[in-house]
């Protein structure tokens, strides 16, 4: 395979750099959002509260601990694929897209990657809720019955491994611009943080509108945490609706 083997020493340096970046990004994004929603007087928050009780310090500590562990897991495939890309062994590319087809693929590939990730997440997430698998694959995340923004990446190790490898593996054979990949990482992060915020930050009119009713927001995902069943999707309500697991909104 072109780009393989990759230099072990450089890959380790990249791995620890990515770990630091992921952890730093987590705190830089989550802390101000948590402060804006939970540390200010409720009347100043321009959002609809979903959680019935204040988050406890123990809950937040667990969310931060699991999210930090997940960072070490997410960094591994990212480091490997970056080193493979530098050696010409992936389908990632850089440079300014050319023409309508170039820019068209930038947009199309973004949707394909998002839908692929959403599909993978829906079915693996649903499988992890099986009673024989739940305790060692997904229980850690559900300790947050009323989640906070800190729960955005609080996964058990098995779940983190399952989620971390999909996009890097796709990047080995499905062309994606480096800028698109970075944008997807930001979308993934912001989406995860707001969906676990315990507050609905989007207007009800938009959520129930022609586009918003197909998108997963905190109103949708919060029910998954409180009921433990249904609403398994990541970005879109498509698979929940197709498979009959959509339980609506808070």
How does the language model describe each region?
Residues 1-123, 127-128, 136-139, 143-166, ...:
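Non-catalytic, topology-defining segments of multipass membrane proteins
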Residues 120-127, 131, 194-198, 218:
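Membrane-embedded alpha-helices of multi-pass transport/permease systems
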Residues 131-132, 203:
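Activation segment
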Residues 174-235, 242:
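Functionally important transmembrane alpha-helices
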């Amino acid at each position: 395979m072109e780009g393989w083997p990759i230099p072990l020493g450089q890959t380790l340096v990249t791995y620890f750099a990515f770990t630091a970046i992921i952890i730093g990004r987590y705190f830089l994004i989550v802390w101000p959002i948590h402060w804006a929603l939970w540390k200010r007087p409720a009347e100043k928050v321009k959002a609809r509260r979903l959680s019935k009780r204040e988050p406890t310090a123990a809950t937040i500590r667990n969310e931060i601990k699991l999210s930090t562990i997940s960072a070490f897991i997410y960094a591994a495939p990212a480091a490997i694929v970056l080193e493979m890309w530098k050696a010409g062994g992936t389908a990632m590319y850089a440079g300014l897209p050319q023409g309508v087809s170039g820019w068209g693929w930038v947009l199309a590939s973004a949707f394909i990657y998002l839908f692929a990730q959403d599909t993978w997440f829906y079915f693996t997430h649903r499988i992890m809720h099986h009673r024989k698998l739940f305790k060692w694959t997904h229980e850690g995340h559900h300790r947050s019955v009323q989640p906070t923004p800190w729960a955005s990446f609080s996964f058990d190790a098995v779940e983190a491994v399952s989620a971390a490898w999909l996009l890097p593996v796709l990047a080995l054979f499905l062309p994606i611009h480096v800028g698109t990949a970075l944008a997807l990482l930001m979308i993934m992060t912001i989406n995860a943080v707001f969906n676990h915020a315990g507050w609905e930050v989007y207007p009800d009119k938009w959520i129930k509108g022609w586009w918003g009713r197909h998108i997963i927001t905190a109103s949708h995902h919060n029910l998954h945490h409180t009921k433990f069943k249904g609403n398994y999707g990541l970005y879109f309500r498509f698979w929940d609706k197709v498979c009959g697991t959509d339980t609506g909104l808070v």
